[in-house]
């Protein structure tokens, strides 16, 4: 299980390093070398940290991930059971929500609770 986690993190970090290594001044090779070293250090640090996790915690995390996969499968099945019109509406609604989240700037009177609630509402309305 830890190997899967490390492999997944390595892929994500590699992709992000690849995207960041394309610089405008043409020093792609230098940036890639630097990012590879950074990536390897992060992977090594995570491996050391993951080795300190208790087996019962690992099992709990694994069970959690299995449950999340089941929930996501049920969400897809429920979405697919909707009419095309309902699916189209939800897709359009999501586009508008994305436009709002991009254009919305944080204000001084926004509390952390309001932000958390808006994230929860967004998650429940998506596929």
UniProtKB/Swiss-Prot annotation:
Where, per UniProt, does this protein localize?
Cell membrane
Q: Does this entry carry the keyword Coiled coil?
A: yes
Q: Where is the lipid attached (N-palmitoyl cysteine)?
A: 17
Annotated segments matching region Disordered: 101-127
Task: Name a GO CC annotation attached to this entry.
Answer: plasma membrane
- Which positions make up the signal peptide? 1-16
Q: Which ranges of the sequence are coiled-coil?
A: 56-101
Specify the protein's topology with respect to the membrane.
Lipid-anchor
Q: Which UniProt keywords apply?
A: Cell membrane, Coiled coil, Lipoprotein, Membrane, Palmitate, Signal
Q: Which PROSITE patterns match?
A: PROKAR_LIPOPROTEIN (PS51257)
Lipid attachment site numbers (S-diacylglycerol cysteine): 17
Q: What is this protein called?
A: Uncharacterized lipoprotein RF_0128
């Amino acid at each position: 299980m830890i190997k899967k986690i490390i492999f997944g993190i390595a892929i994500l970090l590699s992709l992000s390093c690849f995207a960041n290594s394309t610089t405008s001044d043409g020093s792609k090779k230098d940036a890639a070398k630097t990012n590879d070293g950074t990536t390897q250090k992060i992977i090594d640090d995570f491996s050391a940290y993951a080795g300190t996790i208790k087996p019962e915690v690992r099992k709990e995390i694994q069970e959690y991930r299995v449950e999340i996969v089941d929930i996501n499968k049920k969400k897809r099945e429920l979405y697919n059971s909707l009419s095309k019109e309902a699916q189209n509406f939800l897709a359009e609604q999501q586009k508008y929500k994305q436009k709002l989240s991009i254009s919305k700037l944080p204000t001084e009177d926004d509390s952390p609770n309001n932000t958390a609630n808006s994230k929860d509402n967004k998650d429940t309305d998506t596929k």
